[in-house]
UniProtKB/Swiss-Prot annotation:
The keyword Aminoacyl-tRNA synthetase applies. It catalyses: tRNA(Thr) + L-threonine + ATP = L-threonyl-tRNA(Thr) + AMP + diphosphate + H(+). Binds 1 zinc ion per subunit. NCBIfam families: thrS. Belongs to the class-II aminoacyl-tRNA synthetase family. It comes from Campylobacter curvus (strain 525.92). It is found in: Cytoplasm. It is an enzyme of class 6 (ligase). This is Threonine--tRNA ligase. Catalyzes the attachment of threonine to tRNA(Thr) in a two-step reaction: L-threonine is first activated by ATP to form Thr-AMP and then transferred to the acceptor end of tRNA(Thr). Also edits incorrectly charged L-seryl-tRNA(Thr). It comes from the Bacteria. Zn(2+) binds at C304, H355, H480.
Length: 606
């Protein structure tokens, strides 16, 4: 059995330095790759990295070094001159980390008062910044060798446990996330309990670099960004426009088949309506505002208010419910420049957004219908998925009673139908609890995409009503629902999941037709016209380039099918097909090829 590196007591991780005789009533955490063990190992490795940096750069000062998903980071200043480290510096830091780990330093915990710690670190302005954020009371630091840093822990007992680690990337980070403050160095890393697990993680990192949607998006001519336009504002190129349009069209039909009505709300609404909805008080920092004719307006960060206004255009009866509205709504949210990341984190995006107005007795059935719809989508794109219920956050509107009713409605819908789910305490939207649909991609990474939210609050705030069977006015429940989350984010995830090998039914260009010479061009154009009849996008590669170069260009853009036409194909009305996704080459008649493409489209059922 491996050594104990920490304990868990009442759900809290406690290191061996802090257990203080409570071992008998605590659950041991062994040195392995369990989530609890990795949390302790990685947090300790962040301190080991800081110790190495301090050894190499004696004037370095450190801010914070928390765990993040799959690893850790540390924010620090190299020196007063503002020196920035790069990827080339990581090797030397790793080498020093290994030396320090092999020294087998005991890691000790030091407890004191906030005032005493402030005095100890009086010449360290970044430590003073950390102390400002710590409430009064006992404050702890951890020491190993000649290095000491403020920290709550938990840590491994000795640096000997820190053998299998990798520093993965360098970034910049504003002090405390405040864009008006200085930019610090940030180094990310990860650690494991054994060599094989670390090697597998590194393999996944390298594979993720190859699949990076920002890189593939350029290669496939899907989208781009322009600093003159602004950060976080993607520009969709023709290939990307076709991809989005196909996705939108498929989902449009799927929504209509399920009884959803298309609507559209304005993108700019008076601030008064955002005050009424609660967004002004609870979400203002994420919104953009402007003044028109002395009145304040807010650009919508969500589509819910617009759909409420659609609901209010008529008196509604219980016979009308559930009433399902949907919109590909363009929304804008303020994101700090440091967190913008390709299509994953943008300032403008479109949601596949829907709001369902229903009676309380209809909640469960509608949630189950939504989950079935979501399952169909994930199945067609080859994603595994799981669900998580997010509960009331610290900043929220509505009473605890209403929140409990809404949260229980979500749990009951999942429980009664055997769905497994996790709980994210405090992770709900400010107006209601939600089910998050988290998908797993080909690299086993988890992404939060779709969401289902139960909302009793906004119907109350906007005094929504319907007339029941007894001719009395009742309050409807509002279900917020987005299945992809946003088109931008979902497309980015899909590109990385498939390594750019997009499914045939949404590929921007589905077929490239390569005539060997001009003598075969008319036949190529005829095939392109036939494909358009089935809504299949094709391109005739007739540039004055070599045959091999035209084929390589199509392959680089990951076009699913390439057909080559020469004298034999023209004479026999056939095609020489290279099916990229099936990894086959074959000859077939034109009729057979057209049937094959139609079959590929018909395989998709949303």
């Amino acid at each position: 059995m491996s050594e104990i590196i920490a304990y868990k007591l009442n759900g809290e991780l406690i290191d061996t330095q802090s257990i203080n005789g409570r071992e008998a009533v605590a659950q041991p955490v062994y040195f392995d790759n369990s989530p609890d063990a990795l949390h302790v190992i990685r947090h300790s490795c962040a301190h080991l990295m800081a110790q190495a940096i301090k050894s190499l750069y004696p004037n370095a000062k450190f801010f914070v070094g928390p765990n993040v998903e799959d690893g850790f980071y540390y924010d620090f200043r190299v020196d007063e001159a503002g020196t920035k480290l790069g990827e080339s510096d990581l090797e030397a830091i790793e080498k020093k980390m290994k030396e320090l780990a092999e020294a087998k330093f005991e890691i000790t915990k030091i407890c004191s008062t906030k005032a005493a710690m402030s005095e100890k670190f009086k010449n360290d302005d970044l430590k003073q910044e950390v102390l400002k954020r710590i409430p009064e009371g006992e404050v702890s630091s951890y020491a190993q060798g000649d290095f000491e840093d403020l920290c709550r822990g938990p840590h491994v007992p000795n640096t000997k446990f820190l053998r299998f680690f990798k520093l993965t990337r360098v970034a910049g980070a504003y002090l405390g996330g405040d864009e008006t403050r200085e930019m610090l160095n940030r180094i990310y890393g990860t650690a494991y309990a054994d060599k094989a697990s670390l090697a597998e993680h590194i393999r996944i990192i390298e594979e993720a670099k190859k699949r990076d949607h920002r890189k593939l998006g350029v290669e496939m001519k899907l989208f781009g960004f322009d600093e003159e336009v602004g950060g976080g504002l993607p520009i969709w190129l023709p290939n990307g426009g076709r991809l989005r349009s196909k996705l939108e069209q498929i989902l449009y039909k799927a929504h209509r088949d399920r009884g959803y009505e298309p609507v559209r709300g304005p993108e700019l609404l008076k601030a008064d309506v955002w005050k009424r909805s609660g967004h002004y008080a609870n979400y203002k920092e994420n919104m953009y505002f402007t003044t028109i004719d002395d009145a304040e307006y807010g650009i919508k960060p969500m589509n819910c208010v617009g759909h409420i206004k659609v609901y209010q255009t008529e008196i509604r009866s219980y016979r009308d419910l559930p009433l399902k509205f949907f919109e590909y709504g363009v929304v804008h949210r303020h994101e700090k420049s440091g967190v913008l990341h390709g299509l994953f984190r943008v300032r403008e995006f479109a949601q596949d957004d829907s709001h369902i107005f229903c009676m309380p007795s209809q909640i469960k059935q509608n949630i189950l219908e939504i989950l079935s719809f979501a399952g169909k989508i994930m199945q067609n794109f080859g994603f595994e998925y799981e669900m998580e219920i997010s509960t009331k956050p610290a900043k929220a509107i509505g009473s605890d009673e209403i929140w409990d009713i809404a949260t229980n409605a979500l749990k009951e819908a999942l429980d009664e139908n055997g769905f497994k789910y996790g709980i994210d305490e405090g992770g709900g939207a400010f107006y209601g609890p939600k089910i998050d649909i988290k998908i797993t991609d080909a690299l086993k990474r988890k992404w939060q995409c779709g969401t289902i939210q139960v909302d009793f609050n906004l119907p109350e705030r906007f005094d929504l009503g319907y007339i029941d069977a007894n001719n009395e006015r009742q309050r409807p429940v509002m279900l917020h629902r987005a299945l992809l989350g946003s088109f931008e984010r979902f497309i980015g995830i899909l590109i990385e999941h498939t390594a750019g090998e997009l499914p045939f039914f949404i590929a921007p260009t589905q077929v490239v037709i390569v005539p060997i010479s001009d003598a075969h061009l008319d036949y190529a154009k005829e095939i392109a016209r036939e494909l358009r009849k089935f809504n299949i996008d094709s391109e005739v590669a007739s540039k004055n380039e070599s045959l091999n170069k035209r084929i390589r260009t199509a392959e680089k853009q990951r076009v699913p099918m390439i057909i080559v036409l020469g004298d034999n194909e023209v004479a026999n009305r056939s095609v020489a097909l290279r099916d990229r996704q099936a990894r086959t080459q074959s000859d077939m008649s034109l009729a057979e090829f057209l049937n094959l493409t139609k079959e590929k489209l018909s395989e998709v059922h949303f």
